[in-house]
UniProtKB/Swiss-Prot annotation:
Its cofactor is [4Fe-4S] cluster; hybrid [4Fe-2O-2S] cluster. This is Hydroxylamine reductase 2. Keywords: 4Fe-4S, Cytoplasm, Iron, Iron-sulfur, Metal-binding, Oxidoreductase. Pfam families: Prismane. [4Fe-4S] cluster binds at C5, C8, C17, C23. Hybrid [4Fe-2O-2S] cluster binds at H262, E286, C330, C421, C449, C474, E509, K511. It comes from Clostridium acetobutylicum (strain ATCC 824 / DSM 792 / JCM 1419 / IAM 19013 / LMG 5710 / NBRC 13948 / NRRL B-527 / VKM B-1787 / 2291 / W). It is found in: Cytoplasm. The modification Cysteine persulfide is found at C421.
Length: 567
């Protein structure tokens, strides 16, 4: 069986990648990821059973989170490291299974079948109780490859069951990213891990109906909110509340290190280790949000933001001249001209690129990156100017009186939530045109790399309130929810859907999936997704979302604008 992957928006023909991923992963990597997800579900089954008999293990939680994160689009292209995780997952599963059985649990228990006389004459058959994912084991690549052929997405034959299982799995992948970042800052929530194990195990349960899986997907949204709230708490208590910040997009004269991705702990360690070295640190992509946190502003070598969204990195990384640190997705297969300057860490991986491992205490040594930077030229300037951001919930609520007054006076007629992701497709230019053509009495609320489609346009302000309010990274979509709920409270409305807010969201990968499920859990309706609806939504599952939540796609700027402005 050839590879099959349809987890991202750019999947081939909006149906599925079957020869090579549009992301760049080949068939061997795709199948290694399939196998890793399969054995992770098996580990979740054992973990779920363990909870029933009081057996819990934080190491298991951590590994489930990291495995899921590793398979997010554009995170890890290193087949060997993925298969190493498969081996370690099997080992951890068997260790946990022994503890569960000792405590009275049933999973993985050996049962002898065949009747009394077959047992007597030694010809009975031994069988393992539990899903195959919880009992299958192997120790070599040949067996891994053979198993991977059988456990991919298409191994679930029923289209609707498959769709819902993948919707849940992709939501959990997104949630895993947020949990991992929070855990890196020593914040955690056991209830989220318990749900993740339960939900992963449920995707192996053939007895569950479509209705039960729909309910589970919405429950994933509940824990998505909890996960984003936890990460918001971790980030703000560690680094302070984001504040209105003007960020340079030009360059300085010193050599630099470019840090991309989402992990603020990695950013902190890099700033600590580069201080006083003569090496500047620039943010890239969604790491732009690091510029908004007060704690990072004390570092004099913390320069501005270099470049744009992830998909432009081949051109921009080449011109940066110095080393690049990828803390999370999104990585694009690098050009030879800068591949030796690309470092991965955390869940990321790229064959031929050095990987920086965390020590037992979670710290990382960036000395090799700094050493390389000192030998490199300063970044080539690709643009000049400044952008403004830092409008997370605490900052916007501090401006609440001003915002409310603008709404009451009619100066602000409508808010547009245009959070989400950017991508390669030309069809995404829709979002630039949409932002440009919005009436001057509207305000864009954004988070994630979707902002790069319009955050450098001169869209002006309304009474001193910028018309683009950037809350930060994709996880900071939580801030947009908090802002909406606060406005609902201020205006004394029964539902958040009564607010003059429209949702025109660009999605790309699995973190956007958990954001969507979180919004649905909160009761937000009439969300429009683009540039295409997810390929993993079967017609019947899509109909459920349309009928119950008003989910829709996009068409063209003119028609969509009229539809949104009508409320």
């Amino acid at each position: 069986m050839s590879m099959f992957c349809y987890q991202c928006q750019e999947t081939a023909g909006c149906k599925g990648c079957t020869v090579k991923g549009v992301c760049g992963k080949d068939e061997s990597v795709a199948k290694a990821q399939d196998l890793l997800i399969y054995v992770t579900k098996g580990l979740a089954v054992v973990s779920n059973e363990g909870m029933k008999v009081g057996v819990k293990d934080s190491k298991v939680n951590k590994y489930i989170v990291e495995n899921l994160f590793t398979t997010i689009t554009n995170a890890n292209f290193d087949r060997d490291s993925i298969l190493d995780r498969v081996r370690e997952t099997l080992r951890i599963r068997e260790d946990l299974k022994a503890k569960v059985v000792k405590a009275g649990g049933k999973v993985g228990e050996v049962k002898v079948s065949g009747g009394f006389f077959k047992k007597l004459f030694g010809i009975a058959k031994e069988e393992m109780v539990g899903p195959d994912a919880a009992t299958w084991t192997a120790d070599n690549v040949i067996e891994f490859d053979a198993k991977a052929e059988k456990v991919g997405v298409l191994s679930t034959e029923n289209e609707d069951i498959r769709s819902l299982r993948e919707l849940i799995t992709y939501g959990l992948k997104g949630l895993s990213a947020y949990m991992k970042h929070a855990m890196n800052l020593k914040y955690d929530d056991e209830t989220v891990h318990e749900f993740m194990a339960k939900a992963l195990a449920a995707t192996l349960d053939d007895s569950l109906s479509v209705d039960q899986l729909v309910a589970l997907a919405l429950e994933a949204g509940k824990f998505g909110v909890n996960g984003m709230a936890l990460l918001d708490k971790a980030n703000t208590e560690t680094y302070g509340n984001p504040e209105i910040t003007t960020v340079d997009i030009g360059v300085r004269k010193n050599p630099g290190i470019l840090i991309s991705g989402h992990d603020l702990r990695d950013l902190e360690m890099l700033l600590e280790q580069t201080e006083g070295t003569g090496v500047d640190v620039y943010t890239h992509g969604e790491m732009l949000a690091g510029q908004y946190y007060p704690k990072f502003k004390k570092y004099k070598n913390f320069a501005g933001n270099y470049g744009n969204a992830w998909w432009k990195q081949k051109e921009e990384f080449e011109k940066f001249n110095g080393p690049i640190v990828m803390t999370t997705n999104c990585i694009v297969i690098p050009k030879a001209s800068y591949k030796n300057r690309l470092f991965t860490t955390g869940a990321t991986g790229m064959p031929g690129c050095p990987h920086i491992e965390a020590k037992a205490d979670g710290t990382k040594d960036f000395s090799e990156v700094i050493k390389m930077a000192k030998k490199c030229s300063a970044p080539t300037e690709i643009e000049k100017g400044q952008i403004v951001g830092g409008f997370a919930h605490n900052q916007v609520i501090a401006l609440a009186d001003k915002v409310v007054a603008a709404v009451k006076s009619g100066a602000i007629k409508r808010f547009f939530v245009m959070a989400g992701c950017d991508g390669r497709a030309n069809s995404r230019n829709y979002y630039t045109e949409f932002a440009e053509k919005l009436p001057k009495d509207t305000v864009i609320l954004t988070a994630g790399c979707a902002k790069y489609k319009y955050n450098k346009l001169n869209l002006g302000d309304i009474g001193g309130i910028p018309r683009v309010l950037d809350a930060g990274q994709c996880n900071d979509s939580y801030s947009l929810v908090v802002i909406a709920l606060k406005l609902q409270e201020v205006f004394r409305l029964k539902s958040v859907n009564e607010l003059p807010i429209s949702y025109n969201i660009a999605w790309y990968e699995q973190k956007a999936v958990i954001v969507l499920l979180s919004l649905l859990h909160l009761g937000v309706k009439n969300i429009h997704l683009g540039p295409t609806l997810p390929a993993f939504l079967s017609p019947n599952v899509a109909k459920v979302l349309v009928d119950n939540f008003g989910i829709g796609g996009i068409t063209n700027v003119e028609d969509d604008m009229k539809m949104f402005m009508q409320g």
